[in-house]
Every structure is written in structure tokens, then in C-alpha cells.
Amino acid sequence: MNTKIRYGLSAAVLALIGAGASAPQILDQFLDEKEGNHTMAYRDGSGIWTICRGATVVDGKTVFPNMKLSKEKCDQVNAIERDKALAWVERNIKVPLTEPQKAGIASFCPYNIGPGKCFPSTFYKRLNAGDRKGACEAIRWWIKDGGRDCRIRSNNCYGQVIRRDQESALTCWGIEQ
């Protein structure tokens, strides 16, 4: 089976993994693909004002309508947010991780659902208990956006289902080898 089809990851992400790239490099590529990089504030799927790759706060200020940043400023904000997400993984995950696994967890927990929802989650508990396969299964349960079931395509959030599959693939990268 084609690796892209099997894991749903882009050729660019797979190439980085194959080349032995670092977690920051993999996460940057993955988040660019999932979040985009918007220099003008926009509402995310839950109606929250965001900018760049999903930042809700810039320089201590909440993102507001019509906020505009340069690409260079977004690059700086994105690097700060990426580094915070990866630092969270380093502090809170107690099992050894590969670079793709760090990127997958950073995207899912601190970056997308937030630490407040991650800490009590089955995913977090299973992962730190050493049940990696169970943790990867639990990522796929997070498929609601603003109360909408994203498996229902007419809810216009099916990308969430795809993202969870991809985050699960990264988080479990290599455990079956």
C-alpha cells in the first residue's frame, strides 16, 4: 500500500521523516499544511479569532478582528508556539519518543486541543502508562468541533477527522517495526 494513502501524511512530511528530520522541522511542515499561515486574523472552526498558524495571543495581546501581521512576524510567532508545544511534550510525556512521535503529540495535545483538555484525556493517560497503541487509538476520538460531529461531512469539519488520523500516524510512527 502507498505510504501516503496508508498514513494520510503528505510527501513533504514523509520525506522529512525519511531524512531523519528533527521534531521542529516535522512539526513546522505538518502545521503549515494543517493550519496554513494567515497574516490577517480569522475565526477558527470554533469561532475564536486566530492568526498565523492558529495563534490566539500575540505579544501578550488577544488576537482581534482585522489584526494584520507581516509574514516575518508570523514566522516569529509560529516558532514561539511550536517551541512551546514541543517543550510541553518534553515536560509532560514520560515515555521515550522519536522525532515524528514528538511532532504528532505536539500537534494534537498542546497545539490543537490544549493542555487543559489533554491532561485528563484517555490519550494522555494511556501514553504515559506505556500503552502507545491505545493512545494512538484515543487520538481518533477527538473528532468534534464546536459540538459538531466531524465525521458527518455536511458539518464542514471533516478535516478534523483527517488531522486526527495523521496525528495518530505520527504519534505511533515506528512502533510496529
From Swiss-Prot:
Pfam families: Phage_lysozyme. One of its GO terms (molecular function) is lysozyme activity. InterPro entries: Bacteriophage_GH24 (IPR051018), Endolysin_T4_type (IPR034690), Glyco_hydro_24 (IPR002196), Lysozyme-like_dom_sf (IPR023346), Lysozyme_dom_sf (IPR023347), SAR_endolysin-like (IPR043688). It catalyses: Hydrolysis of (1->4)-beta-linkages between N-acetylmuramic acid and N-acetyl-D-glucosamine residues in a peptidoglycan and between N-acetyl-D-glucosamine residues in chitodextrins. GO terms for biological process: cell wall macromolecule catabolic process; defense response to bacterium; killing of cells of another organism; peptidoglycan catabolic process. Keywords: Antimicrobial, Bacteriolytic enzyme, Glycosidase, Hydrolase. The active site is at residues 35, 44. It comes from the Bacteria. Coiled coil: none annotated. The keyword Hydrolase applies. Its EC number is 3.2.1.17. Essential for lysis of bacterial cell wall, by showing cell wall hydrolyzing activity. Belongs to the glycosyl hydrolase 24 family. This is Probable prophage lysozyme.
